[in-house]
UniProtKB/Swiss-Prot annotation:
Organism: Salmonella newport (strain SL254)
Listed GO biological process terms: L-cysteine catabolic process to pyruvate
Protein name per UniProt: UPF0597 protein YhaM
A Pfam family per the record: SDH_alpha
Recorded GO MF terms: L-cysteine desulfhydrase activity
InterPro entries in UniProt: Ser_deHydtase-like_asu, UPF0597
Similarity comment: family membership: Belongs to the UPF0597 family.
PANTHER family reported in the protein's UniProt record: UPF0597 PROTEIN YHAM
Signal peptide as annotated in the record: none
Length: 436
C-alpha cells in the first residue's frame, strides 16, 4: 500500500518489526515446545497418548520455572502436553490461546500417568532447539524447531519425512529484513522514524494495546511476584513518590508480573520474548501519556523503541547469559528520549549510559523473578534518559563504553557472544543441580 512512498530500506525496517514484534501467549521457550508438540499432533489421526521431547540447554533453562498460561503449572512437560492435546499449530506463538479446560485436564492427566518425558538434546550445537515426538497407537510424528521459536525445520512421521527446510539460511539472512537492519545504524533508524508515513507504522499501536492490558491485569491480580501491585501499595503508604519515574517502574513490572505469572493474555513480544516486548513498550507508553502525545507520536516512539531493541538484540545469540530485558530497555530509552526532545545525541547518550549501567545482568532462566529484572531495566532506562537530557552520560573513558554508541553496542554484544558463553554453562549447571 505504501510502496510508492517508502524506500526499500524503510520497507525492510517495517518488515523487520512485523517479523519480530508479534503477539505471544505465555513465555516463548515453553511455547516453542508446545508448538512443536501441536504441529506433531496435527500429523496424527488418533489421540496423542505419549510424548517424548528434547530441548537445548538454553531452552531448558528458560522453561524450568515459568508458569504455562491456563494451567497453574510450571515447566516444559505441561507445555508439551497441552500443545499436543489442545494447541493450534497454525497460531504460532499463540498456540495455546484456544486450549480448552478439558485439554488442560487431559494434559495434567497425561503428566500424572508419566506419559510425558522432556530431555536435554545431547549433543546440541543449537542455542534454541525443541523437538517433540508424539505417539498414537503404532503411529508417531516428530517435529523439530531450530534457531527461532516458531522455525519448524523438519516434520517426520512413521510413514516418512513430510517436510524439511532448505539449507540456504545464511544466504537468505543477508537479504532478509533483519539482515538489512543489522547493517544500518541508529541514525538511519531515527531518520526513518521521523519521516515514515504514520499509516505505515500505525500497526505498532497494537503493542501498546496488548502490553497495556497486561499491565492493568498485573495491577488487578496477584500474579507472579506481584511487584507492580506491591509497589503501588507502597505509594499509597507514602514510601514511594507518585511521580513519572515510579509510574514507569510500577506499570512495566506489573505487565511482566502478569506475563510470567501465567495470565491468559497475550504479550506483544520483541525478538521472541514477551518480556522484551513489554520492556520496549510500557515505559514509552507511560512517558507518552505524561507528555500528552497523540497516537502518531506514540507510534513513532514505539517504532523507535522496538526497532532499536531489535537492532541491538540481533547482534546477540537468540538466547544467552545476558538478560535481554536490558537491551530492550535500551530501545525504551531511545523511545522515551525521542518523546521529550527527539535529538539523536540524547538517544545515543542514553543508550551508552545503559550499557555502562546494567550490561552485566545475567539471564538465569525465565521465571517470576524476570519482572524484577524488567523493572530494574526500565528504571535504568529512565535514569539514563534524565542524564542525557542534561548532556550527561557514561563516556568512552569508562569501562566497556566507547566514544561512539555503535561501538558501545558492539562491545556489549561481543561479551554476550563470547565471554558469557561460559557464564551460561555455569548458570545451567547450577539450575540443573537444584532440579535434582
Amino acid at each position: 500500500m505504501f510502496e510508492s512512498k517508502i524506500n526499500p530500506l524503510w520497507q525492510s525496517f517495517i518488515l523487520a518489526v512485523q517479523e519480530e514484534v508479534k503477539p505471544a501467549l505465555g513465555c516463548t521457550e515453553p511455547i516453542s515446545l508446545a508448538l512443536a508438540a501441536a504441529a506433531a499432533a496435527a500429523e496424527l489421526d488418533g489421540t496423542v497418548e505419549r510424548i517424548d521431547a528434547w530441548v537445548s540447554p538454553n531452552l531448558m533453562k528458560n522453561g524450568m520455572g515459568v508458569t504455562v498460561p491456563g494451567t497453574g503449572m510450571v515447566g516444559l512437560p505441561i507445555a508439551a502436553a497441552l500443545g499436543a492435546l489442545g494447541g493450534d499449530a497454525k497460531a504460532g506463538l499463540e498456540v495455546l490461546k484456544d486450549a480448552s479446560a478439558k485439554a488442560v485436564a487431559d494434559a495434567k492427566a497425561m503428566l500424572a500417568a508419566g506419559h510425558v518425558a522432556v530431555m536435554l538434546q545431547e549433543p546440541c550445537n543449537d542455542i534454541l532447539f525443541s523437538r517433540a515426538k508424539v505417539y498414537s497407537g503404532d503411529s508417531w510424528a516428530c517435529v523439530t524447531i531450530v534457531g527461532d521459536h516458531t522455525n519448524i525445520v523438519r516434520i517426520e512421521t512413521d510413514k516418512g519425512v513430510v517436510f524439511t527446510q532448505a539449507d540456504n539460511a545464511q544466504e537468505e539472512e543477508k537479504t532478509s529484513p533483519l539482515g538489512v537492519l543489522s547493517h544500518t545504524s541508529l541514525e538511519e533508524i531515527l531518520a526513518f522514524v521521523n519521516a515514515v508515513p504514520f499509516d505505515a507504522i500505525r500497526f505498532i499501536l497494537d503493542a501498546a494495546r496488548l502490553n497495556g492490558a497486561l499491565s492493568q491485569e498485573g495491577l488487578r491480580g496477584s500474579w507472579g511476584l506481584h511487584i507492580g501491585s506491591t509497589l503501588a501499595k507502597q505509594c499509597d503508604r507514602g514510601l514511594l513518590a507518585k511521580d513519572l519515574s515510579t509510574a514507569i517502574l510500577i506499570r512495566t513490572s506489573a505487565a511482566s508480573d502478569a506475563r510470567m505469572g501465567g495470565a491468559t493474555l497475550p504479550a506483544m513480544s520483541n525478538s521472541g520474548s514477551g518480556n522484551q516486548g513489554i520492556t520496549a513498550t510500557v515505559p514509552v507508553m507511560v512517558v507518552a501519556e505524561h507528555v500528552g502525545a497523540d497516537d502518531e507520536r506514540l507510534a513513532r516512539a514505539l517504532m523507535l523503541s522496538h526497532l532499536s531493541a531489535i537492532y541491538i538484540h540481533h547482534q546477540l545469540p537468540r538466547l544467552s547469559a545476558l538478560c535481554a530485558a536490558t537491551t530492550a530497555a535500551m530501545g525504551a530509552a531511545a523511545g522515551m528520549a525521542w518523546l521529550i526532545d527527539g535529538r539523536y545525541d540524547t538517544i545515543a547518550m542514553a543508550i551508552s549510559s545503559m550499557i555502562g549501567d546494567v550490561s552485566g545482568m545475567i539471564c538465569d532462566g525465565a521465571s517470576n523473578s524476570c519482572a524484577m529484572k524488567v523493572s530494574t531495566s526500565a528504571s535504568a532506562a529512565w535514569k539514563a534518559v534524565l542524564m542525557a537530557l542534561d548532556d550527561t552520560a557514561v563516556t568512552g573513558n569508562e569501562g566497556i563504553v566507547a566514544h561512539n554508541v555503535e561501538q558501545s553496542i558492539a562491545n556489549l554484544c561481543s561479551l554476550a557472544c563470547r565471554s558469557m558463553q561460559q557464564t551460561d554453562k555455569q548458570i545451567i549447571e547450577i539450575m540443573a543441580s537444584k532440579a535434582h
